[in-house]
Amino acid sequence: MDFLRILLFVLACIMALFTSAIAGGCIQRYGKCSTENSNCCAPSECYFSFNQCF
C-alpha cells in the first residue's frame, strides 16, 4: 500500500469511531458545541475546527 491509501484508511477509522460515539446529537466523550443540549458544551469551550469540546 502506498502512503495515501494508508492515510485514507486511518482517517476512515477515526471517522467511524467518532460517528459510533454520537448519542443524543452530541459526542459522548467530549460533547459537541451547542447550547441547546445539556450534554453539549457552550460555544466558548469549543475546539472549533472539530466543533467539539476538549
Swiss-Prot record:
List the expressing tissues. Expressed by the venom gland.
According to the UniProt entry, its GO molecular function terms are: calcium channel regulator activity; toxin activity
What are its GO cellular component terms? extracellular region
Chief location of this protein?
A: secreted
Sorted alphabetically, the keyword list is:
Calcium channel impairing toxin, Disulfide bond, Ion channel impairing toxin, Knottin, Neurotoxin, Secreted, Signal, Toxin, Voltage-gated calcium channel impairing toxin
Location in the cell: Secreted
Q: Does the keyword Cell inner membrane apply?
A: no
- Disulfide-bond pairs as recorded: 26-41, 33-46, 40-53
The secretion signal range is 1-23
Q: What does this protein do?
A: Binds reversibly and blocks P/Q-type voltage-gated calcium channels (Cav).
Know anything about its domains from the record? The presence of a 'disulfide through disulfide knot' structurally defines this protein as a knottin.
What the record says about family reads: Belongs to the venom Ptu1-like knottin family.
Q: Name the chain's protein.
A: U-reduvitoxin-Pr7a
